[in-house]
C-alpha cells in the first residue's frame, strides 16, 4: 500500500469515528519543503488538539502536499476532484487555510451554521484590486472593487454542492489560461464562472488579525526561526544590460546593494565604473536563460566567494535583504531549495511550477549543483529562464517553495489590504512608480546598518 493510500485511509477512519465537526474538512495548503511540512503538521496537531479539548468531535485535517503524489496540487483546482471523491460523501464544508492560519473551531461552526449546507457557498474575507492590475490581466479594470476574491491568510470555505459542481467541471473542461499566477483570484474567477456561479460572500469572522469574534486569524508572514543568516551566506546576482547601466543600476546601488555581503552585476558588456561582469552571453530582449545558467555556473566555480544561497534578480527588482536573511534561517541549506513567488504552467494537466524571476529566485547551493549536474539546459539564450529552471526542478523532484513575500509586480498591482499586512521581501518593475519611494515605504528597515 502506498504512503498516500495509507494516509487517506487513516483520515477516512478518523472522519467516521468523530462527530460534531465531522462534516468539516480542513485543507492546510502545505508544501513539500521540510520546514513547511513540519509547520503544517504542527498546525494539524493544534487543530485536532483543540477539537479534543472542546469535546465536539474532530474535523478531518488534510495536508495538501500529502493528498496525492502530484506536486501541482498546490494550485487547488487540480486537487478538487480527488478531494470530493475522497471526502464528498462525508463532509458538508471544505475549509482551505494557510499553514500559519489559526482556527477557532467553535466559532467556525457557528459561522457555517448560518449558511444552508445544501446550497452553493463560497465564503471568505474579501479582497479587491485597488486599480487595474497586470497580475490579474486587468480584469474588472473599470470597477476593480466590483469583484472580490478570498484573502488566503484568513482562510476560505466552499460548501459541498459547490465543490461537487467544480469537481465535475474540472474533469470535463480546460482552463482559459495555462498559467497560474495569482491563485486565489483565479479560483474566485473559476467559481464565479462569469456569473453562473456564486461570488465570494464576505464573512467578518474570517480575519487576518485576531479579534474577539474571529473564527480564523493569521499568525505571521515572516516567521521567527532565529538569528538571520549571515550576509556572507547569500550571494546576489543582478542581471542587467548596457542600456540600463545608467538607469536601473543606480537605483540598486542607492537602495539595497549596501545590505549585500556579496553582489555582482552581470551584463552583456563590462563596465568598470559599476562594475559589471560580462559572461559572454549576448543580451536578449526577454528570457535571459543563457545568462542565468552562466550565472549559476559561475556561482559554483571558484570565481566568487562560496555561499550557501544564491539570489538572482533583475535590475528593476527591489529587495529587502535583511528580511530575506531572516526568512532563510527557516530553511536548511543542505537541502535542494528553490524559493520565491511560485507560478505554475499547465498544472491541470501535469505541468510544472516555477519561481517567477522578477520577484527574485533564491536557490540553495545544493539546488544549483543538482540542476547544473543534471544536464538540464536552455534550448536558446532567450528562453524564459524561470520557467526552464522550474521545469528542470520538476523533473528532478525538487519542490518549488512559495513565499507570498516575493512579488513579481509593483505594490499597486496587489490588494492594499493584503500587502499592508506583510513584511515584503521584493517588488518588481519601475514602470509608473518612483522606485526609491517604493523601497523606502515597503522594504527599508530602519535599523542600524550593522544590525541588518
Functional labels for PLM-detected ranges:
Residues 1-452:
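Secretory-pathway lumenal glyco-enzymes, predominantly type II signal-anchor Golgi glycosyltransferases
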Amino acid at each position: 500500500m502506498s504512503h498516500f493510500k495509507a494516509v487517506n485511509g487513516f483520515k477516512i477512519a478518523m472522519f467516521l469515528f468523530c462527530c460534531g465537526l465531522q462534516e468539516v474538512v480542513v485543507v492546510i495548503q502545505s508544501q513539500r519543503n521540510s520546514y513547511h511540512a513540519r509547520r503544517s503538521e504542527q498546525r494539524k496537531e493544534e487543530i485536532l488538539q483543540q477539537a479534543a479539548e472542546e469535546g465536539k468531535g474532530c474535523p478531518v485535517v488534510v495536508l495538501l502536499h500529502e493528498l496525492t503524489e502530484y506536486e501541482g496540487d498546490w494550485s487547488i483546482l487540480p486537487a478538487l476532484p480527488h478531494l470530493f471523491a475522497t471526502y464528498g460523501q462525508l463532509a458538508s464544508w471544505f475549509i482551505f487555510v494557510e499553514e500559519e492560519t489559526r482556527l477557532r473551531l467553535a466559532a467556525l461552526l457557528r459561522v457555517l451554521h448560518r449558511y444552508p449546507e445544501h446550497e452553493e457557498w463560497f465564503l471568505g474575507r474579501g479582497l479587491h484590486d485597488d486599480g487595474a492590475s497586470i497580475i490579474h490581466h486587468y480584469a474588472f479594470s473599470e470597477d476593480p472593487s466590483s469583484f472580490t476574491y478570498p484573502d488566503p491568510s484568513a482562510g476560505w470555505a466552499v460548501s459541498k454542492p459547490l465543490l461537487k459542481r467544480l469537481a465535475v467541471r474540472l474533469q470535463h473542461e480546460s482552463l482559459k489560461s495555462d498559467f497560474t499566477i495569482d491563485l486565489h483570484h483565479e479560483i474566485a474567477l473559476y467559481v464565479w464562472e462569469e456569473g453562473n456561479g456564486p461570488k465570494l460572500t464576505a464573512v467578518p469572522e474570517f480575519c487576518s488579525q485576531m479579534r474577539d469574534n474571529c473564527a480564523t486569524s493569521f499568525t505571521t508572514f515572516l516567521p521567527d526561526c532565529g538569528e538571520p543568516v549571515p550576509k556572507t551566506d547569500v550571494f546576489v546576482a543582478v542581471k542587467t544590460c548596457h542600456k540600463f547601466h545608467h538607469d536601473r543600476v543606480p537605483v540598486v546601488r542607492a537602495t539595497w546593494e549596501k545590505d549585500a555581503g556579496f553582489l555582482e552585476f552581470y551584463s552583456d558588456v563590462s563596465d568598470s565604473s559599476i562594475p559589471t561582469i560580462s559572461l559572454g552571453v549576448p543580451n536578449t530582449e526577454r528570457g535571459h536563460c543563457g545568462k542565468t545558467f552562466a550565472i549559476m555556473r559561475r556561482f559554483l566555480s571558484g570565481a566568487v566567494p562560496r555561499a550557501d544561497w544564491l539570489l538572482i534578480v533583475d535590475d528593476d527588482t527591489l529587495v529587502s535583504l535583511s528580511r530575506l536573511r531572516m526568512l532563510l534561517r527557516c530553511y536548511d541549506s543542505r537541502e535542494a531549495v528553490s524559493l520565491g513567488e511560485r507560478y505554475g504552467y499547465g498544472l491541470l494537466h501535469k505541468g510544472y511550477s516555477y519561481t517567477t524571476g522578477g520577484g527574485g529566485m533564491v536557490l540553495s547551493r545544493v539546488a544549483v549543483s543538482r540542476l547544473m549536474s543534471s544536464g538540464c539546459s536552455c534550448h536558446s539564450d532567450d528562453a524564459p529562464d524561470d520557467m526552464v529552471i522550474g521545469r528542470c526542478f520538476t523533473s528532478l523532484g525538487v519542490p518549488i517553495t512559495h513565499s507570498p513575500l516575493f512579488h513579481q509586480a509593483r505594490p499597486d498591482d496587489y490588494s492594499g489590504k493584503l500587502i499592508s499586512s506583510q513584511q515584503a521581501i521584493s517588488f518588481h518593475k519601475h514602470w509608473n512608480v518612483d522606485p526609491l519611494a517604493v523601497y523606502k515605504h515597503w522594504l527599508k528597515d530602519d535599523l542600524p546598518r550593522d544590525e541588518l
